[in-house]
Amino acid sequence: MRTGRVTPGLAAGLLLLLLRSFGLVEPSESSGNDPFTIVHENTGKCIQPLSDWVVAQDCSGTNNMLWKWVSQHRLFHLESQKCLGLDITKATDNLRMFSCDSTVMLWWKCEHHSLYTAAQYRLALKDGYAVANTNTSDVWKKGGSEENLCAQPYHEIYTRDGNSYGRPCEFPFLIGETWYHDCIHDEDHSGPWCATTLSYEYDQKWGICLLPESGCEGNWEKNEQIGSCYQFNNQEILSWKEAYVSCQNQGADLLSIHSAAELAYITGKEDIARLVWLGLNQLYSARGWEWSDFRPLKFLNWDPGTPVAPVIGGSSCARMDTESGLWQSVSCESQQPYVCKKPLNNTLELPDVWTYTDTHCHVGWLPNNGFCYLLANESSSWDAAHLKCKAFGADLISMHSLADVEVVVTKLHNGDVKKEIWTGLKNTNSPALFQWSDGTEVTLTYWNENEPSVPFNKTPNCVSYLGKLGQWKVQSCEKKLRYVCKKKGEITKDAESDKLCPPDEGWKRHGETCYKIYEKEAPFGTNCNLTITSRFEQEFLNYMMKNYDKSLRKYFWTGLRDPDSRGEYSWAVAQGVKQAVTFSNWNFLEPASPGGCVAMSTGKTLGKWEVKNCRSFRALSICKKVSEPQEPEEAAPKPDDPCPEGWHTFPSSLSCYKVFHIERIVRKRNWEEAERFCQALGAHLPSFSRREEIKDFVHLLKDQFSGQRWLWIGLNKRSPDLQGSWQWSDRTPVSAVMMEPEFQQDFDIRDCAAIKVLDVPWRRVWHLYEDKDYAYWKPFACDAKLEWVCQIPKGSTPQMPDWYNPERTGIHGPPVIIEGSEYWFVADPHLNYEEAVLYCASNHSFLATITSFTGLKAIKNKLANISGEEQKWWVKTSENPIDRYFLGSRRRLWHHFPMTFGDECLHMSAKTWLVDLSKRADCNAKLPFICERYNVSSLEKYSPDPAAKVQCTEKWIPFQNKCFLKVNSGPVTFSQASGICHSYGGTLPSVLSRGEQDFIISLLPEMEASLWIGLRWTAYERINRWTDNRELTYSNFHPLLVGRRLSIPTNFFDDESHFHCALILNLKKSPLTGTWNFTSCSERHSLSLCQKYSETEDGQPWENTSKTVKYLNNLYKIISKPLTWHGALKECMKEKMRLVSITDPYQQAFLAVQATLRNSSFWIGLSSQDDELNFGWSDGKRLQFSNWAGSNEQLDDCVILDTDGFWKTADCDDNQPGAICYYPGNETEEEVRALDTAKCPSPVQSTPWIPFQNSCYNFMITNNRHKTVTPEEVQSTCEKLHSKAHSLSIRNEEENTFVVEQLLYFNYIASWVMLGITYENNSLMWFDKTALSYTHWRTGRPTVKNGKFLAGLSTDGFWDIQSFNVIEETLHFYQHSISACKIEMVDYEDKHNGTLPQFIPYKDGVYSVIQKKVTWYEALNACSQSGGELASVHNPNGKLFLEDIVNRDGFPLWVGLSSHDGSESSFEWSDGRAFDYVPWQSLQSPGDCVVLYPKGIWRREKCLSVKDGAICYKPTKDKKLIFHVKSSKCPVAKRDGPQWVQYGGHCYASDQVLHSFSEAKQVCQELDHSATVVTIADENENKFVSRLMRENYNITMRVWLGLSQHSLDQSWSWLDGLDVTFVKWENKTKDGDGKCSILIASNETWRKVHCSRGYARAVCKIPLSPDYTGIAILFAVLCLLGLISLAIWFLLQRSHIRWTGFSSVRYEHGTNEDEVMLPSFHD
């Protein structure tokens, strides 16, 4: 569309220039995916992470300050590989760096220059730290620019090949421990690739990145003859816009086809996909079909069945069937493969088509730039017109650029072509190829809406133009129209040819206007104020700017500004005139902010408008002089013009509006459908020029319905020509800030806008940002299904298509729609209660009843708007009140709506409604009132069309009086699913009989696990009708739901969640496939089936019964003649088939349908050979599925499929009406497992027994399961089924997995299978008295002390145990469990003879198991208290012995192995024995202590983690007692503290605890202030300390030494200051880098270690104290002698005994008298 006359080569090159004018097309360096710094405007600092906090530092370009936008609006920091996030669960310190897969809030969006996330937290800077605050105005910018952080949004990078079907990259993605934020290269992939999900290692989803490439290498195929390169994305399935963006991101475009040769090349590709997108679209409002690369649309190959002139619901994108080469219009949101295309030759110089050239023509001809034009006054056919032009030496007009179109529209027709005019464009080919009659090349096409519409296989086709834009239309060449002739004129060489413009240099003429560029950059308005009024004028200005600025990026001021900073832009006064805004040409994401002035850009976005700062920004100017008076503007509608009936307005509006909401329409629609709906009425979706209009518009709408609504408006950017800018669908220019910056994200795909309308008054309680939430719009994907509003100018009359049902407003104005009912508010006359009831009845309605919170809220709001706050209005009491929650206050909820007054009268007002509805009123009071009609009148005539009801057409499948349609919508809510079915002219399925149930089941294969059916009700009402209004006469709810206490969560503010809706379950092989579940209607489930009714009943699913019919993998044939069972066998053999075996619910349902429709029973291949004890299939298949009738009074040996679909026994010699034969195809059932050796019983009326290995299983749902069923009752039931059956036991992991598989067939409605575990003799065992040799408890060893518990196997394979302590939990367990019985066909051999013995002798020790949850240290202590040790292993036999203990116990157990420096080489046994045997092959798990798991798995765990027990052993031989000397010269031991022992001149003490080095020093100081960590002076002391540790061993042989290395001189020294005169380093650490040291007591060597790592024993050392004991004894003896002497003297004085003195006695102090013997143990 952008060229004049160019050659084919130049036309091909034109593509690149046009693409380069797109902001979306540039290579990745300008795509917005590049890293940047984040600058705080006030401080100029940049933020960066520091230990997961975010701090502000001086800016630099280093990696530690670089950030990047990545997928899902996350900010990724390059160096830390983390994302900026907010943990809203924390009140403070909530902003941090998180892993990019964290569940905290990681998304960020921009609002002007601020950055915000969830709950309106904004990024702020406080005291040098980045914080999140709800009250901040901090401004953030990209480093090196004035742009906000979202100025260049993140662009998706799409993929090909791989296994992601073209989905875009997910950045960052995780591989190993590295997060990648860009595509990566490696040898395993053919090009740069990325993951398409967050974790590549988990999902393994990937694709080759589609990045810009120069030339046609790599993914591209070159065709030099055509001059283009092609990229065939055959496995990549995208929507049209996604495919378009994928091509654009590579500097290419979607496929366009311009000749039969190119069509043949594309369709001739052998490996091309069957259907591929074309770039053909009509996404630009008010324009026709065009190529997305803007090449002329002159070649066409439409499919004959494609409506290129869409009616309501039409499509605006095109695809090609590559087998036929035909083009089809399809929904732009459908998913197709695609082909990208780009030109080979990228060089192009466009011809000058805009320079004014003075031209001379004959009288009556219009001169313009070298050509002469003549508009004929007469009408002729195209051929006659062509001949007449030839007679003038001219030809019919050809147009090659917008400059030519402008001449036609503005000069020939004065701005409006009111009647069609012939052009010289004509097609005589099939496929169509349009050519100019003058032989010039077609370089421009300018099609009108829905054009070119070429009749199939009918030529010739000719082209006319019409309308204000002069757009083109295909017409019959015989039609008589006026025409324009064109010929070359005489170019005048006169220098005064531009005399219309001022004589100054630089003025350029365009039409009757002159323009000049002022080359000095200046602020806004310095030179002049340029106005731009049309697309033609914009194109001319682009030409001027491009010629002026061919290399630099300059800006040129326009006169557009927002003087009041309201976000509303208008032209400044120019030449004394202020013009209205009639045209806009914004760049993408513009207008970005209010209060600015608008400049035009150059370069790759030539001519696009951008908002700039009026004062600080400097740009060039273009001044404009108009030589002739401006034409008066067309008469606009007046505010007081009337609106049509049923349309609404507000005083300041020039438009009328009509709302199409879900209560009044058949279905919600996507944006295109809604716009075409409005166009069919002569209207458009709404447009706005001022923000005040929006508020008034929302105020107008919010009283017309209840609840929150999203409504389509006309704002969109669907067309590639818009280059990412917004436009209104009615061509109203965009003159205001229409989209908040926060909603400009995802601009590549979200191309249509909707406005939110909701009620305000009730929201103040819980909404903090009411003004923002009150009414705003945001972009949606255009395929979203929403309600909409149509807009028509005031004074206009809407069109009335046949399908439209115009609204009758009524005498009291338009109704308000609330929850599916119409309400009229009758303000006059005032009547009493009974009169009001009669008045409503006379108008086919009722006095309004309030039954819900939503209804109350909506009515209250309406009353507040139309009457005084205290004005009372009559309402009616509810006859069947619905129990609903609603908000009574901020503190409490009212659980019962108080509408239960019977015949009493009620009124309410907007202010006192709560009091009003709680008391009776005076029934005779005269009041206004509210009438209600329950069935809303639809604005669309939706009742199934009689013609459509005759038969089921196209993809609809007939059954009886219904048609069923398979659809695949993905997960949707119930209301969305219902709307989708409405869009097909149907409803969700209603299941009215067993026959319909079977038919639906037969359609279920390949569908999702759960799908909606048309049943909806509340928890407080009885289910009695389907959504198609049919009575509920049949139900098939899953038996597990019977009697179950139901708990479906509801969202208080989501009305839909208060309703329950039904699902049909697709459980694959399960016999319960087809049963119904129910859930909240707001949940999302699959929609797979819709239905509609047909007047003709289809009674035969296949017409000819002699014909074989395929269903799934089998061929079936019905023999319709009387047969015995054996006769049926022979008949099937004659057909080389078998009597049918039914092995799954789908086959059963399919065949049951045949029996139902024919009302005939049929023999099937099931019979008994042992007098009805067991039944089997005649072809030897396993009986794994059954459908026995509930009662079968008489048992016989053969089986029929009866007319009700159930199996019943019959006498084999009876004649039945027929039989079903089949030929099995590829078997769908799994092959019988090799280990399934058991032959299971198969009695009548029993669920089939399922074989696995040597056992048979029966999974049951008991009839009274909602009542308590004890394990004993389950055991009794099993014994009744079979004498050898018992309740379920599980012997190994394979059996556990098998049972889980069976449980999952219940689709999580059942959560457990009950296990047959009982409690006897203080231990758990199976009901058959065998031991639990295999267990899989969820929480480890259960703590059970009695038999009051239930055990069950869960859907995740773990075993759960539930005690009877909590009644609710026990009942929940009962109601969500199924029972299972088991027959072990081979007697189970209990290898261990029951439970594990308490003591187990082995070699020189006795072993026992601590059977309780303990840490490693607790286990060590428990073993020690019983006089033993944790077990150790020293040879393979010992390893097998311990592993056997663990296997028999069934739980992971601690052993005595630990490491205290974190390395495997330092493992030690806690009993002090040598680590001389390694019992594992590898031990990679973290942790310092070792657990032995069942199956012989040795694993490292954290020593403080809790395990299910430990293995202890106690040696049979006692340890040898060793004594050490305790000296009085050593300190006295503190209470419970270690004893001091003497060696040489020092005392030594050690506790039984492990310490770090710093702790060891502290411990010694606490024992005695002069004690230090042990120092060693010689070999003897070294041996003493080592022996002391071995004899008092505990956990480890590592002992801290008080020897450390100085950092300065690297010398070693003892902590007590002594010189280092003796060392004994082990060889392997002699040159180690540790600065501390330990003694290894086992080999008496020293090792260098790091001071801060590991743990060891602490030995403290202190010098001997002086010996004061002898002195004390002597002093005590002397005192005693003194006392004795005094006593003797006293006695002598009393008895006068004579003193003779003491005998001579000598006392000698014993050398060892102060020594005691302390016991110790020796190995």
From Swiss-Prot:
Protein keywords: Disulfide bond, Endocytosis, Glycoprotein, Lectin, Membrane, Phosphoprotein, Receptor, Repeat, Signal, Transmembrane, Transmembrane helix
Disulfide feature: C169-C194, C183-C209, C247-C340, C317-C332, C389-C485, C462-C477, C597-C614, C678-C790, C752-C782, C1061-C1081, C1198-C1212, C1489-C1503, C1636-C1651
Extracellular domain ranges by topology: 28-1667
GO cellular component: external side of plasma membrane
Glycosylation site residues: N135, N345, N377, N529, N843, N865, N935, N1077, N1104, N1226, N1321, N1393, N1594, N1627
Example of a GO MF term: carbohydrate binding
Cytoplasmic side: 1693-1723
Signal peptide: 1-27
Localization, UniProt: Membrane
Tree of life domain: Eukaryota
Tissues expressing this chain: Expressed in dendritic and thymic epithelial cells and lymph nodes.
Modified residues (Phosphotyrosine): Y934
Protein name: Lymphocyte antigen 75
Species, as recorded: Mus musculus
